[in-house]
UniProtKB/Swiss-Prot annotation:
GO terms for biological process: abscisic acid catabolic process; response to abscisic acid; response to osmotic stress; response to salt stress. It comes from Arabidopsis thaliana (Mouse-ear cress). The keyword Transferase applies. Coiled coil: none annotated. SUPFAM superfamilies: UDP-Glycosyltransferase/glycogen phosphorylase. This is UDP-glycosyltransferase 71B6. The lineage of its organism: Eukaryota, Viridiplantae, Streptophyta, Embryophyta, Tracheophyta. Optimum pH is 6.5-7.0. The gene is UGT71B6.
Length: 479
């Protein structure tokens, strides 16, 4: 029987890329499965890039215009996605038109963590919904636990606990979780209500595909398998590695990679902060002082902070000579490079990279682990404060730049991290025989095994396909 799944990712490029990677793996594992990815497009550039990534004729794309301008707040984005339900409904109806020859059997929707309103459309078609959770299982566990406490009326007003030493027992962690490490989105009653509503919808699904590895987050996956939560499928690490060994047309990127090839193994610290990471002039100066004093070789992907990262991405500095400490380029000319945008995966793959200073986004974290590069985490927004705690305190797979950083770029909060704090983190990160480096190498091997035949990712994907097929058979007997 030919079956069809409909994937609905959020418009964020990192979510789109992870969705495409998982969809490709699923269709490769079952010849009777087809997938249509419905892309909510605000950018023709992102859309054309995504649709060019696959040549499989059982993986198709349906583009839905999100309008002329992307909403500039997450809550507005949620409302906007809800308004697109009629367009999604029409697209799916055409897809499974029973009057067409060889029309597939619609088996379900796989919705992004920020597209849960599309569960309503799946219900209209009488098919199950599954959640694709692009972040880590630990944070998913925290979110579900907070929702449980909220509904039981057993939750604090967390906005008052920012400077307290209160710790929360989170079932997806083995260590008590300090509320100082709680992302700021939970410390606003309005935002808390939004995410609690999302978590309730997570529980309505038939299963949750999580971008993680059992050997990486055993405690979190144990919690998610307790029977009160939809089945979790650890399908990670989902990584887009197609650009690792490609020849770059871009001259600057080629020069960067050649420079790395000339450096000793594990000698370069790489600083890169994702698609939304940018810094003020004052913070740039502090970081430059740290790199100067550390004495390490470095590759620094540096961009200017955006006043609203949902409205416009970080930009490039045009006056670095004026911003950086006097003589910085002269003193570091033989051991460092300051660049703009960077091809992160291709750089992490280079043997010269010995450490990665990162915002701790989950995609970046998995890429770093894949290549066996230890991280120093500097969380900037969203769930990254939790990621930092899990990676540093819970798992021993990273070092910290600043404990309990009080900034959040999404909410317009900032706090300067001093040169001394950054330098200390870099020196700790670049220790060649550290326990963190040894642990990262061990987990890196396990991440590679996860993607091999019979590994945890393949097992989870096959189990998911089996469950989807069985759910169809069950629904047919019920009807």
């Amino acid at each position: 029987m030919k079956i069809e799944l409909v994937f609905i990712p959020s418009p964020a490029i990192s979510h789109l890329m992870a969705t495409v990677e998982m969809a490709e793996q699923l269709v490769d594992k079952n010849d009777n499965l087809s997938i249509t990815v419905i892309i909510i497009s605000f950018s023709s550039k992102n859309t054309s890039m995504i649709t060019s990534l696959t040549s499989n004729n059982r993986l198709r794309y349906e583009i839905i215009s999100g309008g002329d301008q992307q909403p500039t707040e997450l809550k507005a984005t949620d409302s906007h996605i809800q308004s697109l339900k009629p367009l999604v409904r029409d697209a799916v109806a055409k897809l499974v038109d029973s009057t067409l020859p060889d029309a597939p059997r619609l088996a379900g929707f796989v919705v992004d963590m920020y597209c849960t309103s599309m569960i309503d459309v799946a219900n209209e078609f009488g098919v199950p919904s599954y959640l694709f959770y692009t972040s880590n299982a630990g944070f998913l566990g925290l979110l579900l636990h907070i929702q449980f406490m909220y509904d039981a009326e057993d939750i604090y007003d967390m906005s008052e606990l920012e400077d307290s030493d209160v710790e929360l027992v989170v079932p997806s962690l083995t260590s008590p979780y300090p509320l100082k490490c709680l992302p700021y989105i939970f410390k606003s009653k309005e935002w808390l209500t939004f995410f609690v509503t999302q978590a309730r919808r997570f529980r309505e699904t038939k299963g949750i595909l999580v971008n993680t590895v059992p050997d990486l987050e055993p405690q979190a996956l144990t919690f998610l398998s307790n029977g009160n939560i939809p089945r979790a499928y650890p399908v990670g690490p989902l990584l887009h590695l197609k650009n690792v060994n490609c020849d770059y047309v871009d001259k600057k990127q080629s020069e960067i990679l050649r420079w790395l090839d000339e450096q000793p193994p594990r000698s370069v610290v790489f600083l890169c902060f994702g698609s939304m990471g940018g810094f003020s002039e004052e913070q740039v100066r502090e970081t430059a002082l740290a790199l100067d004093r550390s004495g390490h070789r470095f590759l620094w992907s540096l961009r200017r902070a955006s006043p609203n990262i949902l409205r416009e991405p970080p930009g490039e500095f045009t006056n670095l000579e004026e911003i950086l400490p006097e003589g910085f380029f002269d003193r570091t000319a033989n051991r460092g490079k300051v660049i703009g945008w960077a091809e992160q995966v291709a750089i992490l793959a280079k043997p010269a990279i010995g450490g990665f200073v990162s915002h701790g986004g989950w995609n970046s974290t998995l890429e770093s682990l894949w290549f066996g590069v230890p991280m120093a985490i500097w969380p900037l927004y969203a769930e990254q404060k939790f990621n930092a705690f899990e990676m540093v305190e819970e798992l021993g797979l990273a070092v910290e730049i600043k404990k309990h950083w009080r900034g959040d770029l999404l909410l317009g909060r900032s706090e300067i991290v001093t040169a001394e704090e950054i330098e200390k983190g870099i020196i700790c990160l670049m220790e060649q025989d550290s326990d963190v480096r040894k642990r990262v190498n061990e987990i890196s091997e396990k991440c590679h095994v996860a993607l091999m035949d019979g590994g945890s990712s393949e097992t989870a994907l096959k189990r998911f396909i089996q469950d989807v097929t069985e759910n169809i058979a069950w629904s047919e007997t019920e009807s």
